[in-house]
Amino acid sequence: MDLPGPIHEILMLFGGFVLLLGGLGVVLLTNPIYSAFSLGLVLVCISLFYFLLNSYFVAVAQLLIYVGAINVLIIFAVMFVNGSEWSKDKNYWTIGDGFTSIVCITIVFSLMTTIPDTSWYGILWTTRSNQIVEQGLINNVQQIGIHLATDFYLPFELISIILLVSLIGAITMARQ
């Protein structure tokens, strides 16, 4: 959006503040319905950031896909689970939880040490894509594809891993 500097900064700060509050709500609220609505608020704030960064296509895709589909699916799934099941489960810690926690912590620490030490620009083909984008020979959708395959390759892969893990978790919960 072409906004004056102070208004742009105020919207960015407001969006960041609401994003932090929504993220804390997702983690700290005990009622799963409230937590799912907080997740929807977080996704809407992320879409606001995309709008402020003049990436309208990604912002609308964020709203339609994540808020309009995935978050609504999460809310429906939580609503179908009986509320008494949440309070009956008194077995809070099992061996599988401990093993999973160790694996996740190991992966996070290995990523934290690997990502800063890796020269991502040597791996990716950014020079060719930047030349094509600067010449203006392609449209916006092709620019998004080129940027996803070059500049934003790592975040794109991390998002795909997060979606895969959430899909596996949903299947596991559905089988129980």
From Swiss-Prot:
Keywords associated with the record: Chloroplast, Membrane, NAD, NADP, Plastid, Plastoquinone, Quinone, Thylakoid, Translocase, Transmembrane, Transmembrane helix, Transport
Reaction catalysed by this enzyme: a plastoquinone + NADH + (n+1) H(+)(in) = a plastoquinol + NAD(+) + n H(+)(out); a plastoquinone + NADPH + (n+1) H(+)(in) = a plastoquinol + NADP(+) + n H(+)(out)
Main location: plastid
Pfam family, one: Oxidored_q3
UniProt topology in membrane: Multi-pass membrane protein
Gene3D superfamilies recorded: NADH-ubiquinone/plastoquinone oxidoreductase chain 6, subunit NuoJ
Segments traversing the membrane: 10-30, 33-53, 60-80, 95-115, 152-172
Highest taxon listed in the record's lineage: Eukaryota
CC per GO annotation: chloroplast thylakoid membrane
Gene Ontology molecular functions: NADH dehydrogenase (ubiquinone) activity; quinone binding
Cell location: Plastid, Chloroplast thylakoid membrane
InterPro entries: NAD(P)H-Q_Oxidoreduct_6 (IPR050290), NADH_UbQ/plastoQ_OxRdtase_su6 (IPR001457), Nuo/plastoQ_OxRdtase_6_NuoJ (IPR042106)
E.C. no: 7.1.1.-
Subunit structure: NDH is composed of at least 16 different subunits, 5 of which are encoded in the nucleus.
Function in brief: NDH shuttles electrons from NAD(P)H:plastoquinone, via FMN and iron-sulfur (Fe-S) centers, to quinones in the photosynthetic chain and possibly in a chloroplast respiratory chain. The immediate electron acceptor for the enzyme in this species is believed to be plastoquinone. Couples the redox reaction to proton translocation, and thus conserves the redox energy in a proton gradient.
UniProt family annotation: Belongs to the complex I subunit 6 family.
Protein name: NAD(P)H-quinone oxidoreductase subunit 6, chloroplastic
Organism: Lolium perenne (Perennial ryegrass)
Gene: ndhG
